[in-house]
Each structure stands twice: as structure tokens, then as C-alpha cells.
Amino acid sequence: MRTLLVFLLLAILVAVLIGNVQVEACKEVDECGDMFVCIEGICEPLIG
């Protein structure tokens, strides 16, 4: 039971760290590539 709790806490920590990296991934509009645009720090696909 204790091992499962430690594993879940580590998984949550890794998910938060990955989320922070993705939010800070882009700062310029054209930084994400051809079919994506940077909106509020996140690469979003162009629709339309």
C-alpha cells in the first residue's frame, strides 16, 4: 500500500513538471512549426 502511494505521488510530480515544460515551450507565434501557432505559451493546431 505504501509503495502504491509513493508511486502515485511520483506520477503526479512528473505530470506537473511535464505540464510546466509544455506551458513554457513557446513564446513566439511562429515557434511551433507550420501547422501550429503559439497561444498563451502552448502550441495549438491551426483549425480552418
From Swiss-Prot:
GO terms for cellular component: extracellular region. Keywords: Amidation, Disulfide bond, Secreted, Signal. Residues 22-27 form a propeptide. Expressed in salivary glands. Highly expressed in the head, body and tail with a 2-3-fold higher expression in the head. Leech salivary gland peptide with unknown function. It is found in: Secreted. Coiled coil: none annotated. Does not show effect on voltage-gated calcium channels, potassium channels, and tetrodotoxin-sensitive sodium channels. Does not show activity on Nav1.7/SCN9A, and shows very weak activity on cation channel TRPA1. Disulfide bonds join 26-38, 32-43. The modification Isoleucine amide is found at residue 47. Residues 1-21 form the signal peptide. The keyword DNA-binding does not apply. The keyword Signal applies. Belongs to the annelide toxin family. This is Peptide HSTX-VII.
